[in-house]
Amino acid sequence: MKKLTIAAIAASMMATAIPASADLAIPLLSYRTGPYAPNGIPYADGVTDYLNMINARDGGVGGEMIKILECETGYNTTKGVECYEATKGEGALVYFPLSTGITYQLIPKATADDIPIHSMGYGRTSAANGKVFSHVFNFPGTYWDAASIIVKHMMDMENGSLDGKKIALVYHNSAYGKEPIRTLQELSAKHGFELVLLPVDHPGQEQKSTWLQVRKEKPDFVTMWGWGV
């Protein structure tokens, strides 16, 4: 009896020492509600469907199932930070906020917590400098890249020169919308075009005055930098 008891205790200790297979926790900071839901819903659905497919088709990754930690932000920066704090303790592997404002706020937090951020083509452009921002990855491009590509396309349309042209930027009046301004200002000085800045405040339902200004300015090109506005 004594031997059986000792054996049972030993078996129990071994079972405790061997960790159970843990889920791979991937937070999904979604916005299915609010003025930007038309963009947020298909994105959240797509990410969810893809990760569920990986679980169903491949049995997860390396034999470990993916656990989706969805948290609704409403595209609100404060709520986004709250979602980060609520999910990071679940063993979060990576964050992809799909919001420049939220990304800005999470960079110092995630860096301190040693959790990577993948802000694919959005977020803080300067985070592309990995020597300074060790935990942020914004490949394959940045807002500055996008602004440069847009201007290059306009130049191609104008036989290689924008000298004397007027370009209006109708942009979302937020961290996201302001990202290309510096690049466009530099390119304006370089290529000789006039840059007209026309902000549209959140959530973008009222734009009449903006387009009246566009009519008044009579730009050669109008670039829309919005997120559903």
Report residues per predicted region:
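Signal peptide-proximal N-terminal region
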Residues: D45-I68, N159-L162, A189-G192
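N-terminal signal peptide c-region/cleavage motif recognized by signal peptidases
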Residues: A17-P19
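Beta-alpha junction/loop-to-helix N-cap segments that form part of ligand/metal-binding clefts
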Residues: A25, P38-D45, R57-N129, F139, ...
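Short beta-strand segments enriched in small/hydrophobic residues
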Residues: D23-Y43, L98, K166-H172
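Extracellular/periplasmic Venus flytrap/periplasmic-binding protein
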Residues: T125-S126, S134-V229
